[in-house]
Amino acid sequence: MSASSTSSSSTSCPEGGEPSGSCKSSDEGESTLKKRMQQYGIASGYANSSISTLDRSQYQSLPLNGTRRVTVQFGRMKIVVPWKESDQTVGQLADAALLRYKKARGMANEDRIHVHRLECASDGGILDMDDVLEEVFDLNYDQILAITDEANGGSTTPTYSQIQKQQHHYAQPLPYARKFDGGPSTPIASAFGSVTVNHQAHRAASPYNVGFARSNSRDFAPQPTHSKERRDSVVEVSSFDQIPQSGLRVSTPKPSRQSEDVIDGKPMNQPILRSSLRTEASGSRTEEATPVKQSRVTLSPEVEKKLAEQDERKSERRKHYDKNPGRFARGSDRKSRITDALLDARDRIADQLESQNPAEETKSQMIRVKIDQGPMPGTSLVTFPPIPEKSENEKQLGIEVNAVFDESSELPGTSEPTKLSSVQIMKIEDGGRIAKDGRIRVGDCIVAIDGKPVDQMSIIRVRASISDLAAVTSRPVTLIINRSLESFLEQESSAKPIQSALQQANTQYIGHTTVVELIKSSNGFGFTVTGRETAKGERLFYIGTVKPYGVALGHLKSGDRLLEINGTPTGQWTQSEIVEKLKETMVGEKIKFLVSRVSQSAIMSTSASSENKENEETLKVVEEEKIPQKLPLPALMTPPVPKDTPALSPSGASRFEIVIPFINGSSSAGLGVSLKARVSKKSNGSKVDCGIFIKNVMHGGAAFKEGGLRVDDRIVGVEDIDLEPLDNREAQAALAKKLKEVGMISSNVRLTISRYNECNPGQISRDLSRITVDASSPSPSSRMSSHTAPDSLLPSPATRGTSSSGADSSHSRQSSASSAVPAVPARLTERDSIVSDGTSRNDESELPDSADPFNREGLGRKSLSEKRGMGAAADPQHIKLFQDIKHQRQNSAPTSSTQKRSKSQPRSSSQRNYRSPMKLVDLPTTAAASASTNSQNLDDSDMLNRRSQSMESINRPVESILRGTGQIPTGSSSKVQFMQAASPDQHPFPPGAALLRLKNEESRSRDKSRRKSMGNPFSAMRNFFGFGSKSRDASPEKTPTESVQLRSVERPKSIIDERNNGSSERAPPPLPPHQSQRRGSGGNVFVDYGEPYGLIPQYPHNTTSGYESYADSELYDRYAAHRYHPRGGPIIDEDEYIYRQQSTSGNSPINTSSYVNYGLPASNAYHVGSRIPPQTSSGSISKTSGAMRRVYPAEYDEDVAYHQQIPQQSTRYQQGSGSGRGNADYHHMFNSWFAYTGGGAVGAAPVIKSSYGSSPVRIAAASAIERGESFVVEPVSGSSASATDRRGRSTSSGAVASGSSSTGFQYAAKEKYADARSGKFNGGSTRLFIPRHGGGLSAAAFATNFGGEAYETRGGGAGGSPSQYRRRDQGPPHRFPQY
């Protein structure tokens, strides 16, 4: 019940005049309302008329005559209650209105009509029955709603529970604006919704419908009643069971007021709407004195169809009850829990509940909206048909929506909303158009509203558009839901209980049928049979279970219906007879089974077609009364094809397009599917690519959220690219490339899918073939033979995926997991069975080895973590440069031979002695003196077999070093020799040996840890980018080519060969001391460019870890300070020069030994080049004050013996008679210089100063070196004066006494450059090479031609001194000397 309260009063003031003092009452007992009205009193011509609360402009004046009234409306009847006292309560108003309503209805006072409560329409506030009305209710600007019910149901006034269910969500009741401009007020939705049959009476009186009611004063003017209005009266159908066929006769109550019948010039009562059929007590209207007349009833086709179906069901029930009077009789129907009687009883109970609940019945009889396929795949188009005039609530959709934002493609993963993509339904209100349809669910997303895309609007505009749809009644309105059309069909069966496969297939309908021939094995057929009887007495038999390793596995399924066995229908047998017949079958005997399979989707489409005829075709299922034996599958059993199903291809597969939106708008995560490639192998052995198929849809991926892809779907196109004519490799490449391109410009991708026409994965597909199963063994891989037969339809499930290229082909499926694109690196095959047509074929085919497109490192095959830069793709080990470095390191580890040594190969002698403080080589003891030159031919790389002793062991005696390492046992002779048998007083590193510095143990462990860290990607990354410690293979000077290939270094030609144009053959060079086997090759010493970290390319097999340069050349001062024991003499004094007594030989002239620094001199003797002690003929030592300590070189008999065999070399080798300088140890001098330059910086070469010259000879003359020039000093005949250097220090005759008896050359103090080809200065030359420096440290090579040209001693006369190695006297100690 709604009560619209208005109040009116009269005043004695003139019309249109201002209130005067006489008009004001001085009575203090008047109510506050009367006082307010007197204050604003204005004369009005509507003193005794009803003023509607819809138009606030009507309140121009309020008569203050002390009389007011409240109009209370009960349905279509309005009751006027006089309101005189100002202190009356709300309960008194309710009682007075109810009393007058009963009296007008002719009801007795004892008839129960209960008023629950009164509410304010503006804010829904509940009025207390004991409160004074004027204190809690605004009579001018508010309205009272009375919530009532009637015991006999005769009133159409809604109950409170109905109103609560039908409250509109969007617009809550709001008070009207207090303005008197006559403009339209804000429309507010009605709280009554679509509850009553006649809503037009409420629409005019309710403030919620102001937007649809006109606010003119003529709306309420008295108008005559026409007969047309009476003919359009409301027709109410109280029962569907007894509907008169000749039309309905209705009684129209006489209106109590003219304003009740006509509002806005239109009749208030409208024709019946099928959405508001209600049972209303028509007896209450028949009591009226108004004469009745005929009215025509118009029912929609949907309602007529529903009524016809109800009549048909009732007639069937009556026949059934006549046949079976007991509902749950213990008969044949009780053998199974799921019987027709039980289902019919459930339907009857449901019908009774629906009849008891009119609201649910009305909901079930509502016209459903039309749902079609949307414009985009995965969407549905919902069309709301135009509706006649209804109440406001029936026009509203009745939904609450919330915004769904699309994340920015530039910032994937961000949570900041950027663009509105759709709106999601959060709540569905009862009574709205969507709630009455019932198929749109909470959570569905709306992407378009009446043709307007949501992504082009704001959320406020979207909500306004949804509200504006209520005003559109002349045309249909549409919504596009982001949900596939199939989901609406599946929703119909969602409320049904979950049933097993047998329960789902337990039906009388005949589905897809096939003939299966099984050969019985020793374990039977491998399935069980279950059966039931219908209410008509029919016997139905089904496949109960299929054993895992039985014959029927893969051919029969639980729930399949057995129609025939060997052509005999099973309906004439009992279950025990069928089981007995199967048991009587002999092993190896063949039996034909005609089975039928019904899918759940077909059942759902059948039920959906009865309720939504516009959306899909009615599924026609024909039940066979008797199946012919000769025709196991009649044409009537062809499965139905829905009207909206895409066109079928010749191979029986449907093609359609689907749009898959990427997750977060980016294609980096892929589609979320794993793909497989199928290859068909023909009987002739050829292979045919069958395309790319969906293997699995990953949970949570883009394809999973879209819901349109299924397993075994074939991808035949992507965007505008057709993949069908391409092979598997080309299709994979095209798909990956297109996905990458589309991901950059779009947030979704369009795929073209080909799908076989199957209802579910387990359905038996149709084909023109019979199946023969040879089940001689229970092995799951049974043999099948295919027979071409026109009267059979279905192949084996094993051959279901055969391509259209040939019926005799079988598939081998190549599969691999991927998040975006297909890849088949592993050749996986699925072996279904061996299919033969007379020729044995193996279906385990593989992709060609040459075509391996499904590569893990292929495009699009990387996981999300790898693409984000923290996976294997960002590992430096995958970078080509890093792989080259790693390959270089693995191949640059030196071994004992040029071949790579495996783990099983023994270590070389140099590797076994790695931990020793110095390098020793085990050689057989041979007599060097008796060996010939040709038989003692050693390789040049033998000089690299040695390593220098550590810095700590340099100052130790040789014996202690050797015995400390255990290589020279105590009291036994040593078998370990330094290239030759050496006496104990010889230095372990004699002249002529290469100086290789031993790496310490710490660096070795570091290298070992670096090799271990190669497997760690973070360590590898750190080392690769230079954050970690350097590896010995990471030297920038060492190119990968040098580490793999062994470069051949062309030895420089001899200067004498260039001068003589190769006319004379040079003799081999003199052997170094202690190395009579040292050299037998052609005569030149070539340059060795050492590497600071790696091996020497020329000698990769003679060292295990290469050089290790020292940080500072000053470390070699200790090496220079070390004193070697002379062969023949002891150390006389520390402050004296150390020299030795030369041993003499009868065949060789042995003179006074020359002396040379075996290392760097002490720092205080750097520039004391003139303090050279005199040397007597007797070999005694003359003491000189402040003289620099030097070491005399050893003179070896082997050298003399060697040069006696080479007469042409003796003269040049021994420069002058009696001079020991000819046998000077230049090898050891080179080692000293080598050690010095190896520890210095770039250009830290020493200065070679001749004892006979006045100026030093710099080895840094790069230009002269490149031109082949050398530094020579020309002798001056007859000159005996002592030469001086640049600083004026005396260097005469190499510090040999002037009275020396030894003979030698005398030189002038003049230095010049001489061309090496000119042959000046005794035809000799000295050629120097610039050392190659790497990383500031390098091993330099100083080569002197001592083949055809002997060494230049640069000494003069007997007792003359050889060259001296010294530092430069000026400039930085580690800088290259500058000119």
Curated annotation (Swiss-Prot):
Pfam families, alphabetized: Par3_HAL_N_term, PDZ
Entry comment describing in which tissues the protein is expressed: Asymmetrically distributed at the periphery of the zygote and in dividing blastomeres of the germline lineage. Coexpressed with par-6; patchy expression observed at the periphery after completion of meiosis I and in meiosis II. On completion of metaphase II, expression is restricted to the anterior 85% of embryo length; this decreases to 55% in embryos between prophase and telophase of the first mitosis. During the first cleavage, expression is detected in the advancing furrow.
Source domain of life: Eukaryota
GO BP of this protein: asymmetric cell division; cell adhesion; cell differentiation; establishment of cell polarity; establishment of centrosome localization; establishment of mitotic spindle localization; establishment of mitotic spindle orientation; establishment or maintenance of cell polarity
Annotated localization: Cytoplasm
Cross-referenced SUPFAM superfamilies: PDZ domain-like
Disulfide bond residue pairs: none
Gene Ontology CC terms: adherens junction; anterior cell cortex; apical cortex; apical junction complex; apical part of cell; apical plasma membrane; basal part of cell; cell cortex
Single Gene Ontology MF annotation: phosphatidylinositol binding
Coiled coil region boundaries: 606-626
Record region (Disordered): 1-32, 208-335, 767-873, 887-918, 949-1085, 1273-1301, 1350-1379
Repeat is among the record's keywords: yes
Domain PDZ: 381-483, 515-599, 659-750
Basic and acidic residues bias spans: 302-315, 322-335, 828-844, 854-869, 1030-1040, 1048-1060
Family matches, as CDD domains: PDZ3_Par3-like (cd23059), PDZ_canonical (cd00136)
Alphabetical UniProt keywords: Cell adhesion, Cell cycle, Cell division, Coiled coil, Cytoplasm, Developmental protein, Differentiation, Fertilization, Gastrulation, Gonadal differentiation, Repeat
Chief place where the protein resides: cytoplasm
Feature: compositional bias, Polar residues: 239-256, 272-284, 967-977
Keyword check for Cell cycle: yes
Residue spans of biased composition, Low complexity class: 1-23, 776-786, 798-826, 894-912, 1290-1301
Similarity comment text for this entry: Belongs to the PAR3 family.
Matches recorded under PANTHER family: BAZOOKA, ISOFORM B (PTHR16484:SF17), PARTITIONING DEFECTIVE 3 RELATED (PTHR16484)
Functional note: In cooperation with pkc-3, required for establishing cell polarity and regulating spindle orientation in the early embryo. Localization is crucial for recruiting par-6 and pkc-3 to the peripheral apical cortex and restricting par-2 to basolateral surfaces. Necessary for apicobasal and anterior-posterior asymmetries associated with cell adhesion and gastrulation during the first few cycles of embryogenesis, and also for epithelial cell polarity in the distal spermatheca. Regulates the asymmetric localization of csnk-1, ppk-1 and gpr-1/2 during the first embryonic division.
Assembly: Required, together with pkc-3, for the localization of par-6; par-6 is involved in localizing/maintaining par-3 at the cell periphery. Interacts with par-6 and pkc-3 for localization at the periphery of anterior cortex of the embryo.
Record's protein name: Partitioning defective protein 3
Gene: par-3
